């Protein structure tokens, strides 16, 4: 099959719609269940490239959670702590390596991952399928599925859950095309290989140390950015992206957005948040929304009398600004990637507040000296990769 008709394009009025191979060859995908749409396939093809490159760079199973053609989260399989199992709501499950990777990718920013598209570098097993079964998700792409996993996935969304199988050996044409306003754009594919050598070739700060964990996390950040709508910045820790700032016109706004998401990820681990007394059988999306509001400055929206009773068995004490500030002071050993250079040191100042210790960015700003000086002030390690990672 070299063509697949779709219901419509980005919006219901955009018809007809299809995906097809310009060279007449077979499509590299097979729809095993459901009817994926135009945006579903944009997410699928972008996200699978991301996880395939993460697997190649780290040697570990990888997963991504995509929304609107940018990753909400991405991760490689690592051992989850009891704390992370609890905040990702998987402490009651036995997790395989690929299931752990998806739990991390989904868990980093659960608000943004609501209704996500899932990508796996490895075969989807029944543990991953059971994890997905209880989450709100639009679909999944993977190189294969075990029979048990496929059976579970086919029960989601009353049997309409989108399941796509992709040829893991598929190699796209070296030249890609895109039409905008009736004009065809042509460019070479971004086949840049992101690896440790790129990180080590030009460390510009006084501190030259890059731990093995930092190298892994910087690779995760940069590969995530390669498939994130620009401008973009990514914070990573423990084998996963913990904050992605996508599609901002200003670099500092990317850094703030991603940093705020990373802060929320860490605040979810605060003892007060982990011990919230939720009512029995609260829906997972309601729990996620409640936690998000509880952590924010608008906590009264879920703690006001007549409201808290919907969510909690007993009224919790608020998480105060002072408590949040003190907790965030313990945030550390975070890695940060940027898809283009930092024009000023203010980005580093903001990153420091979210525990950043390691930075990878292209360099090339006329104020590189200011950025380096700011890193040196905090004894950070910063690598200039010399490579821009814009994606549109």
Protein language model regions, located:
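Active-site loops and adjacent core secondary-structure elements that bind or stabilize anionic groups
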Residues: 1-198, 214-232
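Active-site-proximal loop/turn and secondary-structure-junction residues that shape catalytic pockets
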Residues: 70, 124, 237-240, 342, ...
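Substrate-contacting helices/loops that form the catalytic groove of nucleic-acid
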Residues: 174-210, 268-291
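Conserved helix-loop functional segments at active or binding sites
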Residues: 53, 227, 264-268, 353
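Glycine- and Gly-Pro-enriched alpha-helical subdomains that act as flexible
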Residues: 72-111, 242-341
